[in-house]
């Protein structure tokens, strides 16, 4: 009987499907896991099967460095593993290096950026406006606009191309902050839908598009 490392047993109790998987996507947190769910749903609609048919399970790595630990442990017991995460925490650089050395593929934002900041930085302006509308719908205009001194929704949406760069930074920073605009799986799924909607319009060299394509390529089409 094979005994799993203690570190992983809690995850297997909360997410037993991981035990039966062939491949694991270790997500930094709920936002990233929601994005992966949206991608799986999109693939289900597009080709007729999602990640589960391929034996791929995504897990919430619960932040800090735990998602790297999970990926390393699963890799050590024979699971092909991918990490999907921010790159705004230098405290986990050693864990990231260990994962890479273990042959784990890592889908990473630009250095210093969270997924929220990457989204607002890379997505077409129409997508930025959709993300803003969704945040207001979920949290209210007072929290999203007024408490941050943003003026008005109209001012943001109708801003000039020159000022849009500044708004992208402000919105990304606030979305990432303790206000946590998108920090649950449901919100992450909505972010994923927006990414999928606009990915073909993004510059081919932008990080968010590369992240999406890296995930799609890793998933592949194998259902054996």
Predicted feature descriptions by range:
Residues 1-4:
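Conserved beta-strand-loop-alpha-helix hinge in the C-terminal portion
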Residues 11-26, 30-224:
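Acidic, Mg2+-coordinating catalytic modules of nucleic-acid enzymes
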């Amino acid at each position: 009987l094979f005994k799993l490392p203690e570190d992983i047993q809690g995850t297997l109790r909360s997410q037993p499907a991981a035990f039966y998987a062939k491949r694991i996507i270790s997500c930094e947190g709920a936002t990233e896991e929601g994005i992966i769910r949206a991608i799986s749903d999109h693939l289900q609609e597009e080709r007729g099967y999602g990640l589960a048919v391929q034996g791929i399970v995504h897990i919430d790595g619960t932040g800090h460095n735990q998602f790297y630990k999970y990926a390393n442990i699963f890799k050590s017991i024979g699971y092909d593993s991918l990490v999907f995460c921010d790159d705004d925490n230098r405290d986990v650089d050693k864990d990231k290096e260990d994962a890479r050395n273990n042959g784990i593929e890592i889908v990473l934002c630009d250095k210093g950026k969270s997924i929220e900041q990457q989204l607002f930085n890379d997505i077409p302006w129409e997508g930025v406006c959709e993300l803003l509308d969704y945040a207001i719908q979920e949290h209210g205009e007072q929290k999203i606009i007024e408490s941050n001194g943003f003026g008005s929704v109209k001012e943001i949406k109708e801003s000039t191309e020159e000022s849009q760069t500044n708004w992208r930074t402000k919105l990304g920073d606030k979305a990432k902050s303790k206000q946590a605009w998108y920090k649950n799986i449901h919100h992450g799924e909505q972010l994923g839908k927006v990414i999928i909607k606009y990915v073909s319009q993004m510059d081919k060299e932008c990080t968010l598009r590369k992240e999406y394509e890296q995930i799609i390529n890793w998933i592949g089409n194998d259902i054996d």
